[in-house]
C-alpha cells in the first residue's frame, strides 16, 4: 500500500508559538543551508517511515527536492514523487468547495489501490470526496502542523497498514 506523506507540516512542523527544537542530521545534503527549517525535521522520522510496511512516495510541492534535501537528512532512500499537474479551472472549482488541490491527483495516482495520504491540510471535504470517487480503501490522515508527525500518528498509520491488504505501488 502506498503511503504518501507531505513535507511541510508532517515532517517540518510550523505555526506553534515558541521555539522548535533543532535536530542535527548525520549529514547535510548540499543546498540545505538555503532551507533553515530543515533543522526542524527529526531524523528519527526516516527510521519510523521505513519501518512501516508500505511503499513510501512523496506527496509534496518539494517534488524532487524532497529526495535531494530531505531524504538524505533522515536516511530515506530516493522515493517516487507524485507529479502535480498545472492548476486548472477544475482546481478553482474544487477550492471553492473546500477540496484540497492534491486530492484528485492522489486518487488518480492511486488507481483504485488502497493508499494513505498524510498531510496537515486534509479536511472532511477531502475524505468525503475520496469516499465517493475512490473504490479502494484510503486513509486520509490529518497531522497537526504545529507538532508534525507524533507517536499517535504513527500508531494510526501502522494500524491502517496492518488491517489493509497489501498491494503493489506503481
Language model regions located:
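Alpha-helical substrate-recognition element adjacent to the catalytic core
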Residues: 1-92, 162
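C-terminal cap/substrate-recognition subdomain and adjoining C-terminal extension
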Residues: 66-170
